[in-house]
């Protein structure tokens, strides 16, 4: 906000100037004659000529007083214009909207190529949704420049209070599509849980809560994340402090709710990220029980890349006239090029070594179908001389958290994991995904390859396919409507490194 604006003289008028200046009044009083002398003069001064001279003297003093005011930029044509500009400085600065934007600490612009998955927008700006100024500041400083297609469709509808069932590709901005309206609707002066975001994995909960904290850093909104595998006592202590937004996995939140420490009677918004996974047999019983603690006038926001039959049944049971958004005319990301290499099982490690030597890898994620194979492969890759982390569901939670954050921060180039890491994990530097073991389902394949090519950028997916995997690969192509091409001897870096 521009602070170099014109003001009334200190202590004069009722405008937006500084509070009354006692020094000014003191000097002003010193210029006046004593009170008794003033009465003597009034009683004595009956001459009209003397009265006229006294009035002129008072007018001169007033003009001198106004001349001491700080001058505004530009030449005002008359005093009325000056007063109008003085009393309404913020309105003019808000009108052009430049002052507050000039103070933003923006991250370096991302100059990488982006596909139509995120650029095929209607041309809207975040300001078109009349969001809070402090939320807009957080959005821009997070690096969000304009709404992506899923954000354009979701944000205005969510702000009206309608239920939403949204389907969009991995890595196209779904997290921002629900975090922004949730943060906009939260009242920071009401210290109750007003919104809840449910996710299927602990890593995704940590990532989502971090996004919420970064977007709301200028708002006084308290975000709490809670997942299994962490201290229940710490969560109970935290819930005795103000919490406005709760992010976590269904099982842990249900546990805290049953204990009476997590009170959801004022939680009017429920977000389900990766909704298809939350409605699987693993999570649905906890989810259904958790919903019973919510108020009747709750709002549901459901987001995912795939919606099986279980989602439709849940929608019919709980959602009220939901607004359905489907941006999945093509299931796989436009920017991800997919190849396969026919290999024997015993040749896979050698083939992987060849890929490492030929590909320009920023960061890669390598998927296996079992915990044992993850650990064995990570050991082999380390023996080949490449830096490598691994992560799977049987690891201690603190170790999982450390691996996740260090890989995200670029401490290591390669990560070997199970399907634990396929849901929603957003690491912009990952440009190569390798399916060391071909996934068992087309749904798993879709989420795996979606770890590269995030937010419209380019990526590469390479599948090591054995004789037994041929039918699964063909079935995946048919179900997803995509083509997996044979790998060429030389891969053009332009298709995954721009």
Curated annotation (Swiss-Prot):
Single GO MF annotation: ATP hydrolysis activity
Top-level division of the source organism's lineage: Eukaryota
Domain Helicase ATP-binding, residue spans: 155-325
Residue numbers of Phosphothreonine PTMs: 230
Reaction it catalyzes: ATP + H2O = ADP + phosphate + H(+)
Motif (Q motif): 124-152
Coiled-coil segments on the chain, per record: none
InterPro entries given in the database record: DEAD/DEAH_box_helicase_dom, Helicase_ATP-bd, Helicase_C-like, P-loop_NTPase, RNA-helicase_DEAD-box_CS, RNA_helicase_DEAD_Q_motif
Bias kind Low complexity: ranges: 27-65
Region (Disordered) location: 1-114
Annotated compartments: Cytoplasm, P-body
Alphabetical list of PROSITE patterns matching this protein: DEAD_ATP_HELICASE (PS00039), HELICASE_ATP_BIND_1 (PS51192), HELICASE_CTER (PS51194), Q_MOTIF (PS51195)
Pfam families associated with the record: DEAD, Helicase_C
One biological process term in Gene Ontology: mRNA processing
Domain Helicase C-terminal: 335-495
Family of this protein: Belongs to the DEAD box helicase family. DDX6/DHH1 subfamily.
Described purpose of this protein according to its UniProt entry: ATP-dependent RNA helicase involved in mRNA turnover, and more specifically in mRNA decapping.
Notes on the domains: The Q motif is unique to and characteristic of the DEAD box family of RNA helicases and controls ATP binding and hydrolysis.
Protein name as it appears in the record: DEAD-box ATP-dependent RNA helicase 12
């Amino acid at each position: 906000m521009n602070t170099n604006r014109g003001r009334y003289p200190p202590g004069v008028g009722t405008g937006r100037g500084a509070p009354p200046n006692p020094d000014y009044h003191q000097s002003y009083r010193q210029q006046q004659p004593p009170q008794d002398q003033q009465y003597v003069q009034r009683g004595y001064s009956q001459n009209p000529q003397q009265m006229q001279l006294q009035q002129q003297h008072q007018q001169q003093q007033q003009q001198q007083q106004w001349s001491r005011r700080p001058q505004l930029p530009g030449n005002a044509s008359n005093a009325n214009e000056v007063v109008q500009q003085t009393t309404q400085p913020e309105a003019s600065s808000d009108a052009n909207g430049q002052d507050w934007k000039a103070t933003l600490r923006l991250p370096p612009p991302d100059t990488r190529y982006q596909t139509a998955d995120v650029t095929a927008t209607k041309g809207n700006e975040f300001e078109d949704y009349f969001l809070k100024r402090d939320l807009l500041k957080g959005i821009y400083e997070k690096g969000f420049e304009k709404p992506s297609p899923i954000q354009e469709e979701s944000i205005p509808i969510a702000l009206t209070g309608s239920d939403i069932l949204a389907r969009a590709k991995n890595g196209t901005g779904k997290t921002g599509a629900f975090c922004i309206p949730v943060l906009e609707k939260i009242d920071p002066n009401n210290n109750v849980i007003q919104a809840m975001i449910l996710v299927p994995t602990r890593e995704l909960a940590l990532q989502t809560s971090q996004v919420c904290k970064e977007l709301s850093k200028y708002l006084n909104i308290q975000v709490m994340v809670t997942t299994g595998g962490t201290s229940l006592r710490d969560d109970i202590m935290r819930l005795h402090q103000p919490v406005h937004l709760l992010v976590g996995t269904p099982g842990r939140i249900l546990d805290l709710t049953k204990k009476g420490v997590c009170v959801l009677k004022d939680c009017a918004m429920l977000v389900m990220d990766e909704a298809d996974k939350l409605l699987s047999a693993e999570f649905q019983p906890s989810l259904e029980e958790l919903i019973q603690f919510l108020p009747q006038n709750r709002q549901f926001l459901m987001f995912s890349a795939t919606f099986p039959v279980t989602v439709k049944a849940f929608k019919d049971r709980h959602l009220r006239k939901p607004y359905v958004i489907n941006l999945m005319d093509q299931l796989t990301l436009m920017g991800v090029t997919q190849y396969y290499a026919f290999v024997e099982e015993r040749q896979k490690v050698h083939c992987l070594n060849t890929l490492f030597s030929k590909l320009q890898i920023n960061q890669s994620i390598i998927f296996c179908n079992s915990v044992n194979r993850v650990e064995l492969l990570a050991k082999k890759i380390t023996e080949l001389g490449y830096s490598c982390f691994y992560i799977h569901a049987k690891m201690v939670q603190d170790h999982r958290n450390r691996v996740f954050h260090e890989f995200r921060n670029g401490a290591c180039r390669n990560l070997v994991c199970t399907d634990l890491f396929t849901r929603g994990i957003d690491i912009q530097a990952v440009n190569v995904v390798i399916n060391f073991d071909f996934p068992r389902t087309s749904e798993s394949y879709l989420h795996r390859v979606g770890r590269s090519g995030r937010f419209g950028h380019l990526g590469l997916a390479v599948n090591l396919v054995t004789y037994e995997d041929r039918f699964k690969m063909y079935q995946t192509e048919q179900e997803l409507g995509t083509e997996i091409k044979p790998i060429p001897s030389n891969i053009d870096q332009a298709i995954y490194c721009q």
